[in-house]
Amino acid sequence: MKQRIYIEGDNLDALKILLGSYRNRIKMIYIDPPYNTGKDFVYHDNRTETELEHLESTNQLNEDGQLLENPKTEGKYHSNWLNMMYPRLYLAKKLLKEDGVLIISIDENEIKNLLEICSEIFGEDNIDTAIWQKVDNDSGKMKITYRMRLEHEYVIFCYKNKNKSFFNKFIEERNYKNEYTNPDNDPRGPWISALISNTEENSNPNSDLYYDITTPSGKVITRQWRVEKWEMDELIKDNRIYFGNKGESAPRLKSFINEPKLSTPATLFSNVGTAKTAGKMIEDIMGDRKVFSYPKPTELLEHLIRIVTDSRFSLNPKKSSKRKVFFPGADMGIDLNDENEIILDFFSGSSTTAHAILKVNNEDNLKRKFIMVQLPEKTDEKSKPYKEGYKNICEIGKERIRRAGDKILEESDNKDLDIGFKVFKIDESNFIPWNPKIKTEKEVEQAILGTANNIVQGRSELDLVYELLLQFGLDLNAEVEEKQVNNHKFYVVNNGFLLICLNPNIDESIAQDILNLKEDLMTEYCRVILLDEALNSVSSINIFNDLNSEDIELDTI
């Protein structure tokens, strides 16, 4: 079953649409937005202007009508870009789960300003910054700035709630054998310990992780811990917490010699691919690295995906082998992350994020889902991508996902890996809206007659079905299947949670068909949607009464 989504269209529109069904549901959002280079800028959010009017009103055209660059001497050099980013980041926060994180790749031009708006939206305490080394030390070509070689870019982490975000740890290669002891004669062997709390002065009394612990000696210690109370109780019960020789010291978490030594992810990403390896990956998958400029390496995205969404398996960036890691509660079967986590990228470009998700899903057998969003920005007619048939960036991104999935399946024995994805395009609603500007009685009469069928011509039944899913708060991965019952075709959503019949002509017999279908599906709750034009006033009342008596809700469109 296809559990992944690709959306073509403006990402601001996409975020607004997704909000109804995906609010508080996204675990990780990664974006690599267009950097503010002063060149042509394709994201304009004032929908009252045409593209030409916008360029003219913002003084982006010269006397000959040619596009100007966005020079730093222009007062709006930074504000134009930041005004584009702000509403998108604001909506992105609403989509994140409580333990979710937004990750942004950015260069030196806007790091300072971007950090300011991220702090305003997410809160200053919910921001971290890392550095990605984007070139090898021996790389021949690199940007020179201020007499120095520019070898890095920035990665910003914006947490919805930093106290609830959990980052997976990575295995260190050091030999720690000399540091292990066994002062309490634990039968599991020698161990070392680590703090499992903030210091008393750095604890937040308002945090959900702020609670009391009573030591074996009876001493009460109150501070902000790094695990929830129920998990701490389980760790104490399992003798994984050490309170010192006298049983009165601050708790420390024990890690045994036969368990890997773990390290928190560092702020320097130096072994997770470079711009050069990213280009090589594009070449391997698409046949030519010139198909897409400035992609991020899949290794970087794989690293980010693992530390955010996987509590059980992590990859040491220096190695290629999969390794099992320990986290507090692992021995008790505590799963801190959902194997079906959703990852969103709303500047998806060549679909590096989707490619990376397919790779890590194949390696650890989890079922992460993705939502890719990309504006169908046209490729230059003189460019190689255009000549090879890629008329816009979306065509490149979709083809990369297909080829990457096929390559992964070909090279692995994981025949259960789901590599399929659904494609949606943002457009005007499938339903004709009422025009509020009509005033005269004749205009009202014509409007009523003209909207007896209020569905836009040329739209398919599935177009209507998926818009209705979003209107009713269901996501785009909802199960949809067709079922024919006598003369009526139904779209059955999520095993009968929603039944949609778009037949233009129906009679009162549909009520019994619905009752029979509900019984066959063995569903308790059921909501039915019918076309308003398919009903007359009498049949509508009778059908409503028949269904209402069986606790089935009826809506018409």
Give the location of each predicted region.
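Short, contiguous acidic/charged loop-to-helix segments that flank catalytic cores in large enzymes
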Residues: 76-80, 285-293, 342-345, 362, ...
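SAM-dependent nucleic-acid methyltransferase catalytic core
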Residues: 1-91, 246, 261-267, 271-272, ...
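Short, surface-exposed amphipathic charged segments that create phosphate/polyanion-binding patches used
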Residues: 141-149, 386-388, 436-443, 544
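Short beta-alpha connecting loops at secondary-structure transitions
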Residues: 137-144, 377-390, 446-454
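Conserved phosphoryl-transfer catalytic core
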Residues: 51-72, 372-431
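Post-Walker A helix-loop "phosphate-sensing" segment adjacent to the P-loop in P-loop NTPases
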Residues: 360-366
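Class I S-adenosyl-L-methionine
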Residues: 1-342, 364, 375-380
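A phosphate-binding catalytic loop at a beta-strand-loop-alpha-helix junction
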Residues: 31, 339-360, 469
